[in-house]
Amino acid sequence: MHMQTKLIHGGISEDATTGAVSVPIYQTSTYRQDAIGHHKGYEYSRSGNPTRFALEELIADLEGGVKGFAFASGLAGIHAVFSLLQSGDHVLLGDDVYGGTFRLFNKVLVKNGLSCTIIDTSDLSQIKKAIKPNTKALYLETPSNPLLKITDLAQCASVAKDHGLLTIVDNTFATPYYQNPLLLGADIVVHSGTKYLGGHSDVVAGLVTTNNEALAQEIAFFQNAIGGVLGPQDSWLLQRGIKTLGLRMQAHQKNALCVAEFLEKHPKVERVYYPGLPTHPNYELAKKQMRGFSGMLSFTLKNDSEATPFVESLKLFILGESLGGVESLVGVPAFMTHACIPKTQREAAGIRDGLVRLSVGIEHEQDLLEDLEQAFAKIS
């Protein structure tokens, strides 16, 4: 089945009881039991809810997993995945990993005895060099946030398996429409469903899936034990958003490429980070392992100090956190999404104060270009 069709008909696409084409919102906290220990598959909505279950089946279907899990946020899902590890374990993290993931690991999980080494995961030699006897997991973003680095998933997964490591991939930027890490050797895939999957800036959610039954059982335990589950209303919203993911991603990519090409030629821009440009260092790899390049891009201005006045002059591009909605968003990672990363470490990774990140929406491309141009006109 083609992905475009699977987005609509995958998972549980209708209600088994009534035949409703839209899975109903089961707004309930508990369920009647026939007798003690005998129920119809659901006993308490933290442990399971039919609306959430339909979403979980859908993400597993889209990513090629055996089971999916829906959480109250992307970070709640990532926390559950890292709960698979034990005190004393070591993890490899990307040097431009999302700031929230960095904060979770370095402010919370370290207190539980976990440690990490920050590396450029797009460089396989750095991965091999950083592996220690107690390394248990390799955590990847590809494309990465915010520098849009592309990591060779098949090669990394192969190295990880040789060393007995879990390969965990944040697939938020690419979405299942453009990339399926499990099919390339990864063990676990995580998503911020808040972003492209929801697509309308109206829901906060996290999704996890794996193609390993044993891992699925462990994640299911942590999902229930920790309790950061997604509610039925948000589960329904996310399923509705996913139905149009294909159409939206095509529009996001079309506009992003147009914007990237415009920026690459602009005299006030120093560098553009977009894997859909032939000038991107991993362009050929992106073409090989992805079916498209998504709608995220970043660029640096020639004068770092102009980033703030530039983004504050934009009108259609909304200055705000998050990404992946139908509307275009702009941010300065150094002061927003990645502000929790120490400045020296941030700059060493290439996240300068003058780096601007765009989540290119699905507006008319000419309006977006004109908005960018008028903002450029207001800086030196």
From Swiss-Prot:
GO terms for cellular component: cytoplasm. It catalyses: O-succinyl-L-homoserine + L-cysteine = L,L-cystathionine + succinate + H(+). Its main location: cytoplasm. NCBIfam families: PRK06176.1, PRK07671.1. Its EC number is 2.5.1.48. Disulfide bonds: none annotated. Keywords: Amino-acid biosynthesis, Cytoplasm, Methionine biosynthesis, Pyridoxal phosphate, Transferase. SUPFAM superfamilies: PLP-dependent transferases. Homotetramer. The modification N6-(pyridoxal phosphate)lysine is found at residue 195. Signal peptide: none annotated. The keyword Lipid biosynthesis does not apply. Four natural products, alpha-lapachone, 9-hydroxy-alpha-lapachone, Paulownin, and Yangambin, show strong inhibitory activities against CGS. All these four inhibitors prevent the binding of OSHS to CGS in a non-competitive fashion. These compounds are specific inhibitors against CGS from H.pylori relative to E.coli since they exhibit very low inhibition activities against CGS from E.coli. GO terms for biological process: cysteine biosynthetic process via cystathionine; methionine biosynthetic process; transsulfuration. CGS from H.pylori is an attractive target for antibiotics discovery since the four natural inhibitors alpha-lapachone, 9-hydroxy-alpha-lapachone, Paulownin, and Yangambin also display strong antibacterial activity in vitro, highly inhibiting the growth of H.pylori, whereas no antibacterial activity against E.coli in vitro. These inhibitors might thus be used as potential lead compounds for further research in the discovery of anti-H.pylori agents. This is Cystathionine gamma-synthase. It is an enzyme of class 2 (transferase). Gene3D superfamilies: Aspartate Aminotransferase, domain 1 (3.90.1150.10), Type I PLP-dependent aspartate aminotransferase-like (Major domain) (3.40.640.10). It is found in: Cytoplasm. CDD domains: CGS_like. It comes from Helicobacter pylori. Binds 1 pyridoxal phosphate per subunit. Optimum pH is 7.5. Pathway: Amino-acid biosynthesis; L-methionine biosynthesis via de novo pathway; L-cystathionine from O-succinyl-L-homoserine: step 1/1.
